[in-house]
């Protein structure tokens, strides 16, 4: 299929114009990367025959509210599936994926547990918990994911030695099919969902970061 990407980024932050700039009528450039800009790119690719549009956020810069806005905008104006791809580097990843799911996105990209979060994509295991609570059937064989994770853990250990020369901390093992979450952590998933549904961006991010911290994933902007 033709999966076409609308690459997300943000406008530079300019300093407030000084006295003389204002006096001479000079102002900062107008925003370029607006909702209308991204929708226009998506429409162009849909008209060219795209089978799916991916909101591609390689730097993890898109916060929950913005991705929810774009997902709803795309779903309203183009009639092909919408995918969302992001990373967790600045700390938005998991919260933004949750917001995208609640906004009606068709596909979200994830990583398996031992290669997730940090500079990677959100963990499929955490997304699975959210989807189960929301009544969303992902169609993913989580038993197969668990078997893959066993192999990925060994690969990660090898990479730690060959690439980093040290044993980097790994997240607590977690299989959503067999492990029971502590009540306070399970409640954080519910809190994040409620916050995302209420468009409370700060609370959504806070709850998701606490979930990630519990499992030992890197803090924002840490490897």
Region spans (language model):
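Catalytic cores and adjacent flexible loops of soluble metabolic enzymes
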Residues: 1-223
């Amino acid at each position: 299929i033709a999966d076409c990407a609308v690459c997300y980024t943000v406008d530079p932050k300019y300093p407030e114009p000084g006295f003389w700039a204002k006096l001479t009528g000079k102002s900062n450039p107008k925003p370029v990367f607006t909702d209308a800009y991204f929708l226009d790119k998506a429409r162009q690719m849909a008209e060219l025959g795209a089978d799916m549009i991916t909101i591609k956020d390689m730097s993890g810069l898109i916060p929950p509210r913005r991705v929810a806005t774009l997902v709803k905008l795309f779903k309203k104006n183009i009639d092909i599936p919408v995918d969302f791809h992001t990373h967790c580097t600045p700390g938005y990843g998991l919260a933004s994926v949750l917001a995208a799911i609640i906004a009606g996105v068709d596909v979200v990209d994830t990583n398996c547990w031992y290669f997730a979060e940090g500079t990677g994509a959100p963990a499929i295991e955490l997304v699975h918990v959210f989807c189960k609570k929301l009544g969303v059937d992902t169609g993913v064989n989580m038993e197969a994911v668990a078997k893959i994770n066993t192999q990925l853990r060994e690969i990660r250990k090898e990479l730690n030695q060959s690439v980093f020369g040290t044993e980097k901390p790994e997240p607590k093992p977690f299989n959503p099919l067999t492990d029971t979450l502590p009540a306070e952590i399970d409640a954080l998933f519910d809190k994040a969902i409620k916050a995302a549904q209420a468009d409370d961006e700060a609370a959504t991010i806070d709850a998701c970061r606490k979930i990630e911290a519990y499992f030992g994933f890197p803090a924002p902007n840490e490897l």
